[in-house]
């Protein structure tokens, strides 16, 4: 079964929305998805890099945890999941994902941690020099067929580029408020 982490931040979204709505939107979506397919939903992680660019934290509730702190946590978590035996790990985020390909601090920390965890895990399991061995000569052919250990952990925005193009989207406005309703 896929293992899924709801990932988000505690960020002020005005008086009309809950602090943490970015994570709550992911949790609700995964609850709906769980009715349609078998997945393991990990406890949500709310403590991302929210920043204070919209409002200062005082009296608002935003809690910023820097990417430099998120990275070691995420790397340890992913390493633990790999050691358990999971090979289909996903995190979904709804915070600053309007340009997910380029990335923002929270998702970049988790993406980098995923790569580092996989590299370290493979080196631990296969030994140093594993990628340069003869049995890896067909790596790129296997990769095209989907057999790639670097696909064991993937990050996803809650809303695809197409969804964002087709529906009004904003920060704490009509789009995000509608998402919470």
Regions found by a protein language model. Name each.
Residues 1-181:
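Extended, histidine- and acidic-residue-enriched regions that form the cofactor-binding/catalytic faces
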């Amino acid at each position: 079964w896929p293992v899924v982490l709801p990932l988000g931040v505690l960020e002020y979204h005005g008086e009309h929305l809950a602090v943490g709505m970015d994570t709550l939107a992911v949790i609700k979506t995964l609850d709906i998805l769980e009715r349609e397919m078998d997945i393991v939903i990990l406890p949500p992680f709310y403590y991302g890099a929210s920043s204070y660019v919209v409002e200062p934290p005082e009296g608002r509730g935003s809690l910023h945890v820097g990417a430099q702190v998120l990275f070691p946590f995420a790397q340890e978590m992913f390493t633990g999941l790999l050691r358990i035996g999971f090979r289909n790990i996903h995190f979904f985020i709804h915070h600053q994902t309007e340009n997910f390909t380029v990335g923002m601090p929270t998702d970049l920390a988790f993406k980098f941690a995923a790569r580092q965890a996989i590299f370290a895990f493979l080196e631990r399991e296969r030994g140093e020099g594993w990628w340069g061995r003869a049995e890896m000569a067909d790596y790129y052919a296997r990769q095209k067929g989907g057999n790639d250990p670097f696909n064991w952990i993937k990050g996803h925005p809650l809303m695809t580029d197409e969804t964002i193009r087709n529906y009004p989207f904003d920060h704490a406005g009509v789009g995000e408020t509608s998402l919470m309703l």
